[in-house]
Amino acid sequence: MKKLVVLGGGESGVGTAILGKQKGFRVFVSDKGNIVEKYKKVLLNNEIEFEENQHTENTILDADLVMKSPGIPEKVAIIQLLKNKSIPVISEIEFAAYYTDATIIGITGSNGKTTTTLLVHHILKKANLSIGVAGNIGDSFAQQVAEKSYENYVLELSSFQLDGIDKFNSNIAILTNITPDHLDRYDYDFNTYV
């Protein structure tokens, strides 16, 4: 059985853990901070092993695959250790996309993502399409793939969520705009952000 380590015990992490367990992975969730009580309950109810307030390196470096929550920068030590060991580190969006054949509309940009995502979702729902909304809003994409069977998804995708994308491609992509936001995460280089 392959081991999936999930770094981050929030919305993206817990959703990925649920989907990973459903797909036959041995799942371990690690969060450097506290895991919110509602997420702890979900992990306990699904019998998913977890730790909080630390990252146990030996346990994490034993992974076959790692999902990094969007709030964790690429530069942190544990991510660098994983990359040095050639352990794949992907995003929740990438992981969830492996397990759905749904049509995906991806919406990104510096401003207007949420409004555009909700508008597109509303229009398509009114057109009676089987449509879920996820990404940076609502339930995680991974959790929805695990628990629901939508034929289409509208995903709000922040730049942080797009870090760790390898093969993910939405069927339709919308870029609202690009302005110099979050440059601290991208070494203050606008081209890296873009």
Predicted feature locations:
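Phosphate-binding loop of NTP-binding sites
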Residues: 21-22, 58-61, 70-194
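N-terminal leader/targeting and accessory segments in enzymes
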Residues: 1-91, 95
